[in-house]
């Protein structure tokens, strides 16, 4: 631990409990920010074992990783995890917290008051909530997340699962909506004949009112990518017969 802090976290020290607490809080915050970005773009790590996590808040050692196509919080690209789906998309924030708790357990002998390490877990929870709320605000085109926005996001998550909805296309198309009319998002749905039109139009009316009919489209486009590395794209790249094809 001393070597790690001395070489990678020179602003911290291990001389007392305060130093270790502040160091691990930085790890917790960086981890929370990383996972919020995963959730923003639909990235699924696939194998969130403790040894596949970085104390620098970096995405490493992603094995059977992937990006959501239809918005499905239960999806995982890891076929060995298909029965329990421990590392599914919607579970990633909780798994990151669990992994952080294991890190804190391993360093607890180094602190005089190990119960203080609970402060670090609380810091992760509050940090993730902040990053997650900011993420949703940016994806939906308003600058600040308000408590009443929780219901708007909750209803959106529900609607996205009513009929198979392409996550990437939906949020990118939302950037260009000019009126609260679900027909403008028609290309986002895999089964457009069964779209819950009434539910969507109610939600769009609420969203349109929230953004005062002027969503921050630049902010939305920054946070809603037009392209992600879809699984079929990765397969094409992997099976391309020549280096030239791979460059394409």
Regions found by a protein language model. Give the residues of each.
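Hydrophobic HxD+1 residue recognition
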Residues: 48
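Regulatory N- and C-terminal appendages and interdomain linkers associated
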Residues: 84, 89-240
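ATP-dependent phospho-/nucleotidyl transfer catalytic cores
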Residues: 1-45, 57-146
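Conserved small/polar residues in nucleotide/adenosyl-binding loops
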Residues: 238-248
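Catalytic-loop signature of eukaryotic-like protein kinases
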Residues: 52
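A short linear-motif detector with a strong N-terminal bias
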Residues: 33, 213-214, 247
């Amino acid at each position: 631990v001393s070597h790690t802090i001395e070489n990678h976290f020179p602003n911290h020290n291990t001389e007392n409990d305060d130093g270790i607490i502040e160091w691990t809080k930085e790890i917790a915050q960086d981890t929370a920010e990383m996972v919020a970005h995963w959730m923003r773009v639909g990235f699924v790590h696939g194998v969130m074992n403790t040894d596949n996590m970085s104390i620098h808040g970096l995405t490493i050692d992603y094995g059977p990783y992937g990006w959501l196509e239809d918005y499905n919080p239960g999806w995982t690209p890891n076929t060995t995890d298909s029965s329990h789906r421990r590392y599914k998309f919607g579970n990633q924030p909780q798994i990151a917290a669990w992994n952080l708790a294991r890190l804190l357990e391993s360093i607890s002998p180094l602190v005089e008051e190990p119960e203080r390490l609970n402060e670090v877990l609380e810091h992760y929870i509050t940090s993730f909530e902040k990053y997650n709320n900011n993420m949703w605000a940016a994806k939906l085109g308003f600058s600040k997340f308000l408590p009443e926005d929780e219901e708007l996001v909750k209803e959106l998550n529900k609607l996205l699962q009513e009929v198979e909805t392409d996550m990437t296309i939906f949020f990118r198309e939302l950037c260009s909506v000019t009126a609260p009319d679900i027909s403008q998002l028609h290309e986002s749905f895999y089964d457009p004949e069964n779209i819950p039109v009434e539910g969507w139009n109610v939600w769009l009316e609420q969203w349109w009112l929230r953004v005062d009919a002027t969503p921050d489209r630049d902010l939305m486009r920054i946070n809603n990518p037009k392209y992600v590395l879809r699984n079929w794209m990765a397969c094409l790249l992997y099976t391309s017969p020549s280096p030239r094809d791979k460059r394409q």
